[in-house]
UniProtKB/Swiss-Prot annotation:
Record note on quaternary structure: Homodimer.
Function field: Catalyzes the reversible conversion of 3-phosphohydroxypyruvate to phosphoserine and of 3-hydroxy-2-oxo-4-phosphonooxybutanoate to phosphohydroxythreonine.
Listed InterPro entries: Aminotrans_V_dom, Pser_aminoTfrase, Pser_aminoTfrase_mycobac, PyrdxlP-dep_Trfase, PyrdxlP-dep_Trfase_major, PyrdxlP-dep_Trfase_small
Name listed for the protein in its UniProt record: Putative phosphoserine aminotransferase
Organism: Mycobacterium leprae (strain TN)
UniProt lineage: Bacteria, Bacillati, Actinomycetota, Actinomycetes, Mycobacteriales
Recorded GO CC terms: cytoplasm
Main location: cytoplasm
Co-factor binding comment: Binds 1 pyridoxal phosphate per subunit.
HAMAP family (alphabetical): SerC_aminotrans_5
Cofactor names: pyridoxal 5'-phosphate
């Protein structure tokens, strides 16, 4: 592993990417977003979130997401504080009636299943598990009323298409889209709760969850509320729905997060929307995977090309190349956050290819890796 013996190498400036941020979240924030914060600071920061300037900002975010995902009639953009981690608990309290089914194939898909298993008001979930780097096929079960999986498993770089599985019946489809939303293709009509935090494809900060909820999901929220189930106010979906429809959050939101998100939505929509974003991430990922398959010392960690993510690429290295040393040298040269997910424990690099990342910078990254490996 990389240590004090890792050589000090200065990558030629001509090889380096223009922007060296490849983190899988928090991710690259475009300079134009930061400039927009400066331009609007006086009218937004330090003002009440119950008044027009901030409410208009929330409305701008909700309208932007509705346009980006071409929401069907009756679908609503709901939001609350706490990130996707908070939404897992909110869904356990307010979206699952009796029992859920979870596909788990990495750290984050497993965490939702774990949160549900700890909730005292619902039954033990069904968990269908596969090893990291692969994924189970979405399936239904007559005993469940929610079926959940991750559009993109950030820890491993596995992407699972979003389609209502055969045999799902009336079960709600809940998709963790934290690293998929805005960078992978999706038909929102195939989901009932498509939820995410904005620090990945949307190039914002964390601490906020957003969920695109279907009429069926909104009706489920109402029915669970009517049942009298106890729910902490902070995790209450009916409170989140009520406030969201007023372009508010239950408690004070981080204005910076909302403003960065709004700017990124404007940028995505101005360039062609989700179709453009998906083509861009496809371009970046094709460059990364083609390089990895061409080199004798690298292979894509995800063996099945159909499961390889367009937005988070994981690349294994042969035993004679220390990927940790490569990442350390990259970081010393301003090319950062290419380390693998900490708990995966593999000799690999992980590369985010969200829309804000230039495809040419992905190619430049691969050239830098080649340059380093030649000198190790």
């Amino acid at each position: 592993m990389a240590d004090q013996l890792t050589p000090s190498l200065d990558i030629p400036a001509a090889l380096k990417p223009r922007d060296g941020r490849f983190g899988s979240g928090p991710s690259k924030v475009r300079p134009e977003q930061l400039q927009a914060l400066t331009n609007t600071a006086a009218t937004l920061f330090g003002t009440s979130h119950r008044q027009a300037p901030v409410k208009n900002l929330v409305g701008r975010v909700r309208a932007g997401l509705a346009e980006l995902f071409s929401l069907p009639d009756g679908y609503q953009v709901i939001l609350g504080n706490g990130g996707a981690t908070a939404f897992w608990d909110a869904a356990a309290f307010g979206l699952i009636d009796k029992r859920s089914l979870h596909l788990t194939y990495g750290e984050f898909s497993s965490k939702f299943a774990s949160a549900v298993a700890k909730n005292p008001f619902i039954d033990e979930p069904i968990v269908i598990k596969s090893d990291p780097g692969s994924a189970p096929k979405p399936t239904g079960d007559p005993s469940v009323d929610v079926i959940a999986w991750a559009h993109n498993e950030t820890s491993t770089g596995v992407a699972v298409p979003v389609r209502r599985p055969t045999g799902s019946g009336g079960a709600l489809i809940a998709i963790d889209a934290t690293s998929g939303a805005g960078g992978l293709p999706v038909d929102i009509a195939q989901t009932d709760a498509y939820y995410f935090a904005p620090q990945k494809n949307f190039a914002s900060d964390g601490g906020l969850w957003l969920a695109i909820m279907s009429p069926a999901a909104l009706a489920r929220v109402d029915s669970i509320t009517a049942s009298g189930r106890w729910v902490p106010d902070f995790l209450s979906l009916p409170i989140a729905v009520e406030n969201s429809l007023k372009n508010q959050t239950y408690n004070t939101p981080a204005i910076c997060t909302l403003a960065l998100l709004a700017e990124q939505l404007d940028w995505l929509l101005g360039n062609g929307g989700l179709e453009w974003a998906v083509k861009r991430t496809a371009d970046s990922s094709q460059r990364l995977y083609a390089w990895a398959e061409d080199r004798p010392y690298t292979t894509p960690f995800v063996v099945d090309p159909a499961l390889r993510s367009q937005v988070v690429g994981t690349i294994d290295f042969t035993d004679d190349v220390d990927a940790a040393a490569v990442a350390k040298i990259l970081r010393a040269n301003g090319i950062i956050d290419t380390e693998p997910y900490r708990k995966l424990g593999r000799n690999q690099l992980r590369v985010a290819m969200f829309p804000a990342v230039e495809p040419d910078d992905v190619r430049a990254l691969t050239e830098c890796v080649d340059w380093i490996v030649e000198r190790l």
